[in-house]
Amino acid sequence: MVAAKENKFLTVAPFECAWSDDLKFREAGRGCVAFDAFAHNDVTVVFRENVGTQHYHYKKDNSPHYIVIIGSNRNRRLKIQVDGKSVVDEEASDLCRCSLEFQSYWISIYDGLISIGKGRYPFQNLVFKWQDPKPNCNVQYVGLSSWDKHVGYRNVSVFPVTHNHILLWKQVDCREVRGDESGDEKVVEEGTGYDYEQWGLGNFLESWQLSDTVFLVGEEEMDVPAHKVILQASGNFPLRSSDGDVIQLRGVSYPILHALLQYIYTGRTQILESELAPLRDLSSKFEVMSLVRQCEESIDHFKLSKTAFDSCRKVKLLCPISHPLSGFMFPSAFPVDVGKLVKLYSTGEYSDIKIYLSDHSLTFQSHKVILSLWSVAFAKMFTNGMSESHSSTIYLTDVSPEAFKAMMNFMYSGELNMEDTVNFGTELIHLLFLADRFGVVPLHQECCKMLLECLSEDSVCSVLQVVSSISSCKLIEEMCKRKFSMHFDYCTTASLDFVLLDQTTFSDILESADLTVTSEEKILNAVLMWCMKAEESHSWGVIDEMMNYADPKSLFKERLQSLDDLLPHVRFSLLPYELLKRLENSNLSKEIPVFNRLLKEAASFLTSGLISPGNEPISRFQHRRSSFKELQYIRDGDSNGVLHFVGTSYGSHQWVNPVLAKKINITSSSPTSRFTDPKALASKAYAGTSFAGPRMEDGHISSWWVVDLGEEHQLMCNYYTFRQDGSRAFTRFWKFQGSMDGKTWTDLRVHEDDQTMCKAGQFASWPITAANALLPFRFFRLVLTGPTADTSTPWNFCICYLELYGYFR
C-alpha cells in the first residue's frame, strides 16, 4: 500500500517539520519514501519511531531517529545523523542540486541500510548508501523538515521495500495500490494470476513433489523428502548422482532436521533453546556454515547475558541478507552458495530435466526445483499432472537460444549478465519476451531496468513497437511514450520509425502533457507523415504539393480515416496567423474537411478569442505547458518568482534588478517620481512610501500597476504576491488581470472587500484558479476598482513589491 500526498504542495518553514499518519512505513524499520523537493538547500527528512512535533529540532530529540539532509553546507554535502550524531558527511554534488525547480528523490531504509537516490522511481539511480552497524529496526514515521530556509515538497509517497521494483514504479505512476482492508501486501503479477511474493522454496519444504532424496530420521526411520541440488548448494551432504539416495540419521530427532531444512529452504527457522546445540552439530556435520554461526551466536548470547536456561523458550534464527537492494535477487532468502549452484548447473550433476530447443537442436540440462523456484509457470508444468510432470525432457519452440541461455544463467546465479554486442538490444527484447512467457518476474524486472537504462531517442520507437504488445510492460510503454513526447522534434525527424507505431500509441504521444516541440508546425508535419506512412521526411508544404497530382485517398490510403482522429491533436491556434492563412488556401484545407474546420476554428479564436460551440476541448487553445519553465510559489517574499528569475538573466547569473537591466518594464497610472518608482516593485527592499496615483480614464478614476514581461515572453500565472508600503491605505477592491497586447484585459482574480491587508509592510499572496491559470499572457495589471481603507488617499495603490509565479517562457 502507498501513502501519498499526491500533487499536494507542502511548504515547510525553517526549523519546522511536517508529520502525517499517512507518512508511515508499513513494516517498522523497512520502507521507502519518494518525493519532489524545491529548495535552496537542506532538504531534510526525519525517520522516527513515533510522530514528532511541528517545531522539531534534532538536538532536542531524545528518541531514536535517523535524519537525512540533502544539500547541507550551502548545497554541497549529504549528511546522515543517527540520534543527533553525524555519521555521514559526504561530498555529493550529483545528489545535492537543490534549486528553483522540483527535484525527485527517494530514500529507503531496510534494517539500518539507508539508500538514497535521485529520480521519480524508487531503487533506480542509487547515489549513496550506508549501513548502520547498530540498526534501528523500529523507525516508522517520516517527517518532512527544513533548516534555515523554506522547503517545498510534493508527490510524497511511502512504499514498502520489495524486490519487485517494477510494481513500485507502477504505484508511482498510478498513486494507488489495491489491497484488502487488513493491509496484507500481495503482489499478483499481471497476466499470471499467481501471488509471486508468496512463492519460493518454502513451497517445496519436505514435499514429495520433485524430490529426489530422502532422510530417514530417528529410530522409527521417519521419511523426510528433500532435493539434492538445494541441499548441495547450501552445504555438503553425502549424495550420489543416481536417484533414490537415502541419508540415515538415527541419532537425530525430527524437530532438529526440520529446523535445518526449514532454514535451508526458507532462510529462517525457530527452535527450542535446548535444541540449539544439536542443531549446531547437525549443521556442522553437513557444513551449513551460516546456520552454525547463527546457533553459536545465540548460545554465546545466552551465556554472556547469564539468562536463566529455559527449555521451553524458542529462538528465532534468520539467514542474514547483506544487500537487500542489490542486483543479486534470488526469490527466496535461503543460504545458497551461488558458486556451487552455478557449478551444479554447468556440470549437470543431479539434473532431472532436459530442455530441448526444437528450432535450434540445442539441449540444456537443469533441475526442476530450480526452474520451479523462479517460475510458477514451470512449477505448474512439473506438478499438475501434465505430460512434463512425468517426463525428463521438454521441448520448446520459438525461443532464441541466446536469450534462453541468459535466462538459465540468471536462474542459477541470480544476476543478469549480457554481453554488450551489436545485437544487445535485440537479445534483450527476446529475453524480455521469454521472461514474460514463463513468468520469471525478477528477470522481467531486470530486463525492464536494462531497457530503461539504455533507452535513447534513437531506440524509443523500436522499443515501443515491441513492448506495446506485452501486457506486463505497460510501465515501460508509458516511459517510452514520455521520452518520445519530451524529444518529439528529434524522434520525428532523425528517422521515420515513428510511422510504424500503431495509432493508439501515436495518439497517446500527441495527447501527452510532456509533449515538447519547437513549433506546432512540427506536430502537423508528423501527423501528416504518419497518416501517409511516409518513406521520406516531408513538410506539410511538400505533401500539399503532392495533392496537386493525387487525391487524399490515394495519398493516405488505409490511414485516411486516422486524419479525423489525429489532426485535432494539432493546436492550430499556436501557429502564426500568417501561416494559418497559407494553410487555409492549401490543397489540404480544400480536400480534407476536418483540416478546414480546425483552421477556421483556430482563426476565429485568434481574431476574437471565441471558441466555436460543440464542447471542443479547451486544451486545443492553450500553450503546451511543457515548453514553459515552472516557477512556483513557496512563501511570501521568496526568490522563486518570475521577476526574480528574469533578474538573474533567466537563471544565468546573480540577480540584478530586471527593470534597471531593461529585461522587463513596469509602468503605473501616475508619472514616475520619488514615491512612484517602478524599479522598487521589482526589488525586495522595503519602501515606506510607494504608490501609483489616480488618473482619469474614460471618465473614471483609475489607479494601476502594469508589468510587461517583454515581446518574447509569456506567463501562465497561478499565484501572485504584493507587499503593502508603510501607509495604511490598505487595498480592499481590486483586480489582477492579464493581457497579450496591453489593451484587452482578462480578469484573472477579482477581489471584492478583501480584508487580507491590515498591516504596514505586510506581504500577501493569492492563487489564480481554474482555467485562468492556464492562459498565457505578456502583460499583467493590478488595478483598483474601489477606494482603499485610507480616506485621505482612497485611490492611491500603495504597494512596494510585486512578484508573479507560474509557468514562464
From Swiss-Prot:
GO terms for biological process: protein ubiquitination. Transmembrane segments: none annotated. It comes from the Eukaryota. Pathway: Protein modification; protein ubiquitination. Gene3D superfamilies: 1.25.40.420, Galactose-binding domain-like, Potassium Channel Kv1.1, Chain A. Coiled coil: none annotated. Residues 211-273, 351-420 form the BTB domain. InterPro entries: BACK, BTB/POZ_dom, FA58C, Galactose-bd-like_sf, Methyltransf_FA, SKP1/BTB/POZ_sf. Keywords: Repeat, Ubl conjugation pathway. Residues 466-537 form the BACK domain. PROSITE patterns: BTB. May act as a substrate-specific adapter of an E3 ubiquitin-protein ligase complex (CUL3-RBX1-BTB) which mediates the ubiquitination and subsequent proteasomal degradation of target proteins. The BTB/POZ domain mediates the interaction with some component of ubiquitin ligase complexes. This is BTB/POZ domain-containing protein At2g30600.
